[in-house]
Regions:
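Nucleotide-sugar donor-binding/catalytic module of glycosyltransferases
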Residues: 1-234, 350, 354-356, 360-370, ...
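A general, composition-driven signal for non-globular sequence regions
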Residues: 66, 77, 156, 379-380, ...
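Low-complexity, intrinsically disordered/propeptide-like segments
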Residues: 26, 30, 60, 383-386, ...
């Protein structure tokens, strides 16, 4: 084992549980880094494996040119514990959390470190590539030295597989929440985004390969929904705590509502018992306290309507909306509103007794009605509309008429 006394550029933290044979390729990808073995260290935590993972880690550490420390511990029940152990032992300027099932592209760390050094940012995202699975791509449209967390798509990339500046993590005392059985990486990454000195994106190279295991291990069971609500509520409360009220907070809150809560109330809810439906509604209550018009107007009508039903506690209307979606019906486009607004007539549109506001059906972001693209109309803000209305009424009371429009011929001579 090469124990390099020089401070490495990167500490790669590998938490490993029943990781064979995927661990072999994972560690080989660290050895293959163009950054060079003298600039990398590995801290590998064997989390109570019984499949030979621990033995392979020791064998690797004994022969590898990359300085490697191996820790063996009893199974902790999740990824947070091993990651925290590795983070506490890290010596590198940067830390990268590499899952034992996955692997790096050869140039990944060299490119990520170069970006962080050049831009001075505390978090760097490297482009993901799925192996036997789909991965998000919208946040990797282009390489950028600095992105705005509030307006960019990086807020939809909250997994832990990123380069983090260790000084930031140490200063904040930032660790993974070991009380959360799922979603712990979302809180960790979001806090680093919001409290760090900027976020960069490396989008021109496949830095990280996310692997779908053939044996299906490590997959979260669909039925275990209470922990998901716990994680979503924690993420929502973190955003509210760190971001003051206003448009920026509203934009951030779109993430837990659409990538999280919405999935718990999808069409599959129709197959679940009344008891489960009501239980989910109860679990959503702490989170929907932060549902607001500012958040709602940033979401498409179909998704917003589901969330509005949850916020209003209307499981009956929600069932009608989900059946409408499940059967692939197309909402009618309703125009002619005196304010120029456009609506999509999903179930219960125009029903004043429903408790669902008419605004829930309004097109406020680019949307779809079947194959037809629907663009929102641009209207004056409510305060401006009121001011214009008052001014017009005052003019009418004074007997002032609006001037007629006249065509004026310009003399170009």
């Amino acid at each position: 084992m090469n124990q390099n006394r020089v401070v490495p550029d990167v500490t790669v933290v590998v938490g490993a549980y029943e990781a064979m044979p995927y661990l072999v390729r994972c560690l080989e990808s660290v050895e293959s880094q163009t950054l060079g073995p003298d600039r990398i260290e590995i801290v590998a935590v064997n989390d109570g494996s019984t499949d030979g993972t621990g033995e392979y880690l020791e064998e690797f550490a004994a022969r590898s040119k990359v300085a490697t420390r191996v820790i063996h511990q009893a199974n902790s029940g999740g990824p947070s514990g091993p990651r925290n152990v590795g983070l506490r032992m890290a010596r590198g300027r940067y830390v990268f959390f590499l899952d034992a099932d996955d692997f790096f592209g050869d140039e990944a760390l060299e490119r990520l470190v170069a970006m962080a050094d050049r831009a001075g940012t505390d978090v760097v995202l490297g482009r993901l590539k799925g192996v036997g699975r789909k991965v998000g791509s919208s946040m990797f449209a282009r390489t950028e030295e600095r992105v705005d967390v509030h307006s960019s798509r990086v807020v939809f990339a909250l997994s832990a597989q990123k380069l983090f500046r260790r000084e930031l993590l140490s200063r904040l005392g930032l660790e993974f929440d070991e009380t959360l059985p799922t979603g712990e990486d979302s809180l960790f990454t979001m806090e680093a985004y919001l409290r760090g000195n900027g976020v960069s994106v490396v989008a021109d190279y496949d830095c990280y390969h996310l692997v779908a295991r053939d044996d299906g291990k490590h997959a979260t069971r669909r039925g275990s929904y209470p922990p998901r609500f716990q994680a979503l509520t924690a993420l929502t409360e973190l955003i509210v705590r760190l971001e003051p009220p206003g448009p920026k907070r509203d934009q951030l809150l779109v993430r837990p509502f659409t990538v999280g809560l919405l999935q718990q109330f999808g069409p599959h809810l129709l197959k679940e018992s009344e008891e489960v439906r009501r239980h989910k509604l109860e679990l959503a209550a702490p989170m929907v306290r932060y549902w607001s018009r500012g958040v709602a107007d940033r979401i498409k009508v179909g998704e917003r309507l589901v969330l509005a039903c949850v916020a209003a506690g209307r499981l009956d209307i929600l069932a009608d909306v989900l059946e409408f979606v499940r059967t692939k019906q197309v909402p009618e486009v309703v125009t002619g509103d005196r304010r120029g607004r456009i609506f999509l007539a999903y179930p219960h549109f125009g029903d004043r007794r429903s408790g669902i506001p008419r605004s829930a059906y309004q097109v406020t972001v680019p949307d779809w009605s079947g194959s037809r693209r629907i663009m929102p109309t641009v209207t004056l803000p409510s305060l401006a509309r009121r001011a214009v209305g008052r001014a017009r009424r005052d003019l009418r009371r004074l007997g002032v008429r609006r001037p007629r429009r006249r065509r004026v011929k310009l003399d170009n001579g």
